[in-house]
From Swiss-Prot:
Gene transcribed to yield this protein: CAM1
Compartment(s) where it occurs, according to its Swiss-Prot or TrEMBL record: Cytoplasm; Cell membrane
Further comment found in the protein's record: This protein has four functional calcium-binding sites.
Quaternary context: Interacts with ZAR1 (via CaMBD domain). Binds to IQD1. Binds to MEE62 in a calcium-dependent manner.
Pfam family name, one: EF-hand_7
Binding site for Ca(2+) 1: D21, D23, D25, C27, E32
Keyword GTP-binding part of the UniProt annotation: no
Protein name: Calmodulin-1
Disulfide bridge partners, by residue number: none
Organism: Arabidopsis thaliana (Mouse-ear cress)
Length: 149
């Protein structure tokens, strides 16, 4: 996972990590993790932090070493990338930029992609993704359906 990071990213993470490794023993406490991540432009919730800590702190000693931290950051960066890609994809479908994908917009994009769909197929795709039943797909619904793939 961490091997997907650039040298530049690694040194940026090392710098941030070192700032919070007060005693220089190569470990930061789980409490400090949130502060480090926020300094790197991530904005994890308390619940996310707890999940990350449980995931990373393999020996359960309450501290995170730099290799563990790198793996964690690599994973977060990957998640952030795919979130950006999803937003971009949603914008492509949402032709009028009103925050919703209508049946007409879905049909238009699918046709441009070479997918000739019947009205029934388009309606079925909308129904599948349309959690709140308003006949169109909002961003949350779009993310849910895309992440399920």
């Amino acid at each position: 996972m961490a091997d997907q990071l650039t040298d530049e990213q690694i040194s940026e993470f090392k710098e941030a990590f070192s700032l919070f490794d007060k005693d220089g023993d190569g470990c930061i406490t789980t409490k400090e993790l949130g502060t480090v991540m926020r300094s790197l432009g991530q904005n994890p919730t308390e619940a996310e932090l707890q999940d990350m800590i449980n995931e990373v702190d393999a020996d359960g000693n309450g501290t995170i070493d730099f290799p563990e931290f790198l793996n964690l950051m690599a994973k977060k960066m990957k998640d952030t990338d795919s979130e950006e890609e999803l937003k971009e994809a949603f914008r492509v479908f949402d032709k009028d930029q009103n925050g919703f994908i209508s049946a007409a917009e879905l049909r238009h994009v699918m046709t441009n992609l070479g997918e000739k769909l019947t009205d029934e197929e388009v309606e079925e795709m909308i129904r599948e993704a349309d959690v709140d039943g308003d006949g169109q797909i909002n961003y949350e619904e779009f993310v849910k359906i895309m992440m399920a793939k």
